[in-house]
């Protein structure tokens, strides 16, 4: 069952659209509510409808019994900017579950039933928010995540003339500030969690071997997680930074959430 909701967000100071897939009467045996729920964050330049209709989300939801909630990411990298009255991280990580649980009581409110994931920019946001709200999310799935957004401050050789530096400066406050930030910098956030004996939610990550945008960063991040002794299935397979690759990996991501 596919639903499109419109609700007022206090964190964003405006109305927002929320797309929801419920594993109910889709031609498969339907689980009994409350449903386990995956909050899934789109990547840069994508929106919720692209995620819902270009990837087999409805099929995966029906097969796994997991509801899927997708907001629009709006190229925000899920960062908070209270000075602009726009707190995209607070919305996606905290307010979105609160809104959907209130409007749809069929969604489970238990931590062990609540997951977060995303693609590219959304993968970065999912990891950041899983660390920021460890009492809310129990598992994380990251598809080709932009885990080192500071890498985007530099112009990419395969994208000549295209620089994301101005956007990253606006969102992250510049590379120096990002590097020192204990929330935006995922390595610092993980080190802080470990130092304070807080759990790093179990995570699954994948990236295509032909992904020149975030592939090297994903390899470095995986090595960092190994160094910190954080278990994380990391799937490297043929593919680029595109919907074709993510389509092929989505079932594995849901299997991880399902505990298989």
Where are these regions (language model features)?
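Non-catalytic cap/lid and distal C-terminal segments of serine-dependent acyl enzymes
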Residues: 1-260
């Amino acid at each position: 069952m596919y639903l499109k909701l419109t609700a007022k967000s206090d964190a964003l100071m405006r109305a927002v659209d929320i797309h929801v897939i419920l594993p109910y009467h889709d031609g498969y045996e339907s689980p009994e509510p409350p449903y386990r729920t995956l909050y899934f964050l789109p990547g840069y330049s994508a929106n919720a409808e692209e995620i819902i209709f270009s990837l087999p989300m409805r099929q995966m939801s029906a097969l796994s019994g997991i509801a899927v909630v997708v907001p629009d990411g709006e190229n925000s990298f899920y960062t908070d900017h209270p000075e602009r009255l726009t707190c995209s991280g607070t919305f996606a990580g905290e307010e979105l579950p609160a809104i959907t649980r209130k409007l749809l009581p069929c969604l489970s409110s238990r931590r062990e039933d609540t997951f977060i994931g995303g693609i590219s920019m959304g993968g970065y946001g999912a990891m950041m928010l899983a660390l920021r709200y460890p009492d809310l999310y129990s598992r994380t799935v990251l598809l080709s995540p932009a885990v080192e957004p500071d890498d985007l401050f530099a112009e990419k050789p395969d994208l000549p003339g295209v620089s994301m530096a101005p956007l990253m400066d606006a969102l992250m406050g510049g590379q120096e500030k990002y590097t020192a930030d204990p929330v935006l910098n995922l390595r610092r956030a993980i080190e802080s969690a470990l130092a304070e004996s807080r759990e790093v939610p179990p995570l699954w990550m994948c990236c295509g071997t032909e992904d020149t945008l975030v592939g090297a960063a994903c390899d470095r991040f995986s090595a960092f997680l190994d160094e910190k002794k954080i278990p994380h299935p990391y799937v490297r397979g043929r593919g680029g930074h595109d919907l074709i690759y993510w389509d092929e990996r989505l079932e594995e991501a849901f299997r991880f959430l399902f505990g298989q």
